[in-house]
């Protein structure tokens, strides 16, 4: 009987091992990521969603009234986006064309490159996931780190327990993957989309993702699900160490926490010509206070800078409870010609310059300071009732810093704070005291910038013609108009063409972001 039991266990173990999917060595996957067992293997390798069937390239159509038994042609469309994703050719890719109406998502999973997902011309497709089931963590999930060349255009994305869209990476928290082999989804374009009413973040970008463009989108009502009830962590765009991200001509509004940030060592990001209104925390943020240590690349960033070489320019920010612009452990940040209105309503500061706080690194806790900042031609306006400071240094920045030609205005007295360290700080009133104690803003002004109802410069504004020359860094304004040789201060260049409406004019089908042109 004992021998029979041993034989049965051996037989069961052999059967289980024979069913185990064969994996391929990492070097072989590097050479051919589409080999079976590699991240970009085709569904035919062993995908129950495709049942080993053929893949499709070219165009495929999906309609709420279609059938997954169809062939995906325009005349016989699939019913679900997941079916189209499952049959996508892993090398040639697939153009997925969505007919108008609502497409239900049970977390659409993409795992191949060269995906172009968009609405049928003249129609508007809505992709909707529920926010109450944790297993449906994202409405759209690009799950394979090796994937690249992803375009999402002219669609509306809503829901997801955590995220509207998530781009994945192989960056692990136990540091088992060498830095040189860490990567995420690359070459991403999100164009003319609405992304809203998500459980937490509208767009989630994980460490190692690269070359991300978010253009002409409307992003709103993050953090609407049960996942955010206790967390209060729901950005419009949450980018952790995703480099080369450009966010342009987007309209963010009614965001639970920060409109967008790039932190964790993200490099070479650009935030420009965006409109941000009504944020529960900050508006435009480079870095953050306490990113987890495992998300930094300490080979290229041993100092744990949160943000490297970011450019923030020509944005309008209205109504933030915390900072209008926040720089945390930022290296070489450039902040030019932004207009920030009614910022720091409840806490923080209109302009926050702060150290980072990275805990639990292999060599102990780290507190990197900002370094080599350039902040010019910005307008900061607070209401008389604002509880936050006008500006704050939480750790004096290092290196060579040029903070100049800015306008600060608040009815009544301006308030400031400088923290040299945890036990040595001062809170004080008066712009002259700020200049003396911070050694910044020598050429800046405390005066009413005279803005109109659209947050553009009114006739007679003292900001007209008084900006610092910045060459090719600032060639256009918020509206896309040419600046010319003599810069104004703020996001608007006066009298250079038609101003965009603020907020943007709603359109029946789709979105145009701010209405600006890329």
Predicted feature locations:
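Bacterial Sec-dependent N-terminal signal peptides
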Residues: 15-55
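Right-handed parallel beta-helix/beta-solenoid
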Residues: 25, 45-83, 102, 449-453
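Surface beta-loop-beta hairpin patches that serve as ligand-binding interfaces in beta-rich domains
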Residues: 46-49, 87, 424, 428-445, ...
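Acidic Gly/Asp/Thr-rich repetitive segments characteristic of extracellular carbohydrate-active
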Residues: 64-99, 109, 434, 479, ...
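Extracellular beta-strand-rich solenoid/capping regions of secreted or surface-exposed proteins
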Residues: 82, 86-91, 103-118, 126-183, ...
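Predominantly extracellular beta-rich ligand-binding scaffolds that present long acidic/polar faces
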Residues: 106, 111, 311-454
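Right-handed parallel beta-helix
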Residues: 118-124, 148-159, 178-197, 209-225, ...
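Structural detector of coil-to-beta-strand junctions
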Residues: 137-141, 163-164, 201-202, 225, ...
């Amino acid at each position: 009987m004992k021998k029979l039991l041993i034989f049965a266990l051996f037989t069961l173990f052999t059967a289980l091992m024979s069913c185990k999917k064969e994996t391929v060595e990492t070097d072989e996957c590097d050479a051919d990521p589409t080999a079976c067992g590699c991240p970009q293997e085709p569904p035919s390798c062993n995908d129950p969603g495709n049942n080993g069937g053929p893949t499709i390239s070219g165009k495929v159509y999906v309609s709420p009234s279609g059938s997954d038994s169809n062939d995906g042609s325009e005349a016989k469309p699939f019913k679900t986006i997941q079916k189209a994703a499952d049959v996508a050719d892993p090398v040639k890719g697939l153009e997925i064309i969505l007919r108008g109406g609502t497409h239900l998502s049970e977390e659409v999973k993409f795992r191949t490159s060269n995906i172009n997902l968009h609405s049928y011309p003249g129609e508007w497709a809505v992709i909707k996931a529920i926010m109450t089931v944790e297993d449906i963590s994202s409405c759209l999930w690009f799950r394979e780190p090796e994937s690249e060349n992803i375009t999402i255009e002219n669609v509306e994305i809503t829901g997801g327990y955590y995220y509207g869209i998530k781009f994945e990476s192989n960056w692990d928290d136990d540091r088992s993957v060498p830095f040189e082999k860490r990567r995420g989804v690359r070459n991403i374009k999100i164009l003319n989309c609405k992304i809203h009413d998500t459980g937490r973040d509208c767009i989630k970008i994980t460490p190692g993702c690269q070359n991300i463009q978010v253009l002409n989108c409307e992003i709103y009502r993050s953090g609407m699900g049960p996942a955010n009830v206790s967390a209060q962590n729901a950005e419009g765009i949450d980018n952790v160490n995703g480099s080369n991200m450009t966010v342009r001509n987007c309209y963010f509004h009614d965001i639970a926490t920060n409109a967008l940030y790039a932190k964790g060592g993200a490099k070479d990001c650009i935030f420009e010509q965006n409109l941000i209104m009504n944020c529960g925390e900050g508006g435009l943020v480079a870095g953050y206070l306490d990113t987890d240590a495992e998300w930094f690349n300490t080979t290229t960033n041993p100092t744990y800078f949160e943000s490297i070489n970011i450019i923030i320019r020509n944005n309008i920010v209205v109504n933030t409870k915390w900072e209008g612009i926040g720089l945390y452990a930022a290296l070489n940040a450039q902040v030019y010609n932004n207009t920030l209105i009614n910022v720091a309503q409840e806490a923080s500061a209109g302009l926050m310059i702060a150290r980072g706080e990275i805990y639990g690194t292999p060599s102990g806790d780290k507190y990197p300071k900002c370094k080599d900042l350039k902040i010019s031609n910005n307008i900061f306006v607070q209401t008389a009732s604002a509880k936050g400071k006008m500006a704050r240094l939480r750790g004096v920045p290092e290196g060579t810093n040029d903070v100049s030609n800015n306008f600060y205005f608040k009815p009544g007295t301006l308030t400031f704070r400088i923290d040299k360290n945890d036990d040595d700080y001062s809170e004080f009133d008066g712009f002259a005291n700020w200049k003396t104690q911070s050694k910044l803003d020598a050429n800046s002004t405390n005066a009413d910038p005279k803005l109109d109802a659209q947050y553009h410069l009114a006739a007679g504004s003292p900001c007209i013609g008084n900006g610092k020359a910045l060459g090719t860094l600032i060639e256009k304004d918020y509206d896309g108009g040419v600046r010319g040789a003599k810069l104004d201060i703020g996001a608007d260049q006066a009298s250079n063409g038609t101003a965009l409406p603020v907020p943007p004019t709603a359109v029946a089908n789709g979105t145009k972001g701010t209405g600006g042109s890329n």
